[in-house]
């Protein structure tokens, strides 16, 4: 019965003058480790009235909330109401308790760079208020022209290559979402892009045998260089001593020759 009522609501939305809105066929694209959020909702957007487990919609309640309005003001039409599945005559009004607000999974993103507040623009509704015993996940039916914004979840950082947003557009009679240019990577991860060289392995990352071989080879080279240096030093010292001896002998011969020449005179 609910499915027939929902179909009737969709047909009414499309056929009533002034309420025409082209629904997007698919959901916004999913990005790994990222969530999306609409900062404002275009007129014609619908939100299913879903209740958490153990609760159901009241019989006279609406199946969905609808963003409607005029050129100056837009708001959500209808209200979602949930009642306990075990109690038929108990109807609970829309005033969520603080504990239930904490339990409810919110789709709102906390971003330091918020896009332009579209809710201040004509033809847009703000985030609809929560209702008591609401389901943990909200299901929206977006219309053409809707924009959603993406943000990485906690523990991941964004690598931007372009706009981190997706827009529902009509192309050749079919609706499609543009692909957001966002990549989310872990805080400790290093992404490998084309043209980026891998870091060379350090000696600490090599096997023990290879490291030992490297150290042994290096030590041998150092010892060989030290031995060659020592031999050069010894050879140089011996050469200097020999030259000094020759010079001393030459001086001695000259002195003796001079003394002998003086005695003869």
From Swiss-Prot:
PROSITE patterns reported for this sequence: SUSHI (PS50923)
Chain spans, region Disordered: 87-123, 190-210
Topological domain ranges for the Extracellular compartment: 22-240
Upper lineage: Eukaryota, Metazoa, Chordata, Craniata, Vertebrata
Superkingdom of source: Eukaryota
Record-annotated membrane-spanning stretches: 241-259
Amino acid composition bias (Basic and acidic residues), ranges on this chain: 195-209
Keywords: Disulfide bond, Glycoprotein, Immunity, Membrane, Receptor, Repeat, Signal, Sushi, Transmembrane, Transmembrane helix
Disulfide bonds: 24-67, 49-80, 51-82, 125-168, 152-184
Pfam families per the UniProt record, alphabetical: Sushi (PF00084)
Stretches assigned to the Cytoplasmic side: 260-265
Species this chain originates from: Pan troglodytes (Chimpanzee)
MF terms (GO), sorted A to Z: interleukin-2 binding; interleukin-2 receptor activity
Name of this protein: Interleukin-2 receptor subunit alpha
């Amino acid at each position: 019965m609910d499915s027939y009522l929902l179909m009737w609501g969709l047909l009414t939305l499309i056929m009533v003058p002034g309420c025409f809105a082209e629904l997007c066929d698919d959901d916004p694209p999913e990005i790994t480790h990222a969530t999306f959020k609409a900062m404002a909702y275009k007129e014609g957007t619908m939100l299913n009235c879903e209740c958490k487990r153990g609760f159901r919609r009241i019989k006279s309640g609406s199946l969905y909330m609808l963003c409607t309005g005029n050129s100056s003001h837009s708001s959500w039409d209808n209200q979602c109401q949930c009642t306990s599945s075990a109690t038929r005559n108990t109807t609970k009004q829309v005033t969520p308790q603080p504990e239930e607000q904490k339990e409810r999974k919110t789709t709102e993103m906390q971003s330091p760079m918020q896009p332009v507040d579209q809710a201040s623009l004509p033809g847009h509704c703000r985030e609809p208020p929560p209702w008591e015993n609401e389901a943990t996940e909200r299901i929206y039916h977006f219309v053409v022209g809707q924009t959603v914004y993406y943000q990485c979840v906690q523990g991941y950082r964004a690598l931007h290559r372009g706009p981190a947003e997706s827009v529902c557009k009509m192309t050749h009679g079919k609706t499609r979402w543009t692909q957001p240019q966002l990549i989310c990577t872990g805080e400790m991860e290093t992404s490998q892009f084309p043209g980026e060289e891998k870091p060379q392995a350090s000696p600490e990352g090599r096997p023990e045998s290879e490291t030992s071989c490297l150290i042994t080879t290096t030590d041998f080279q150092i010892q060989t260089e030290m031995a060659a240096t020592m031999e050069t030093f010894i050879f140089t010292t011996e050469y200097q001593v020999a030259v000094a001896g020759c010079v001393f002998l030459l001086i001695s011969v000259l002195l003796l020759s001079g003394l002998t020449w003086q005695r003869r005179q």
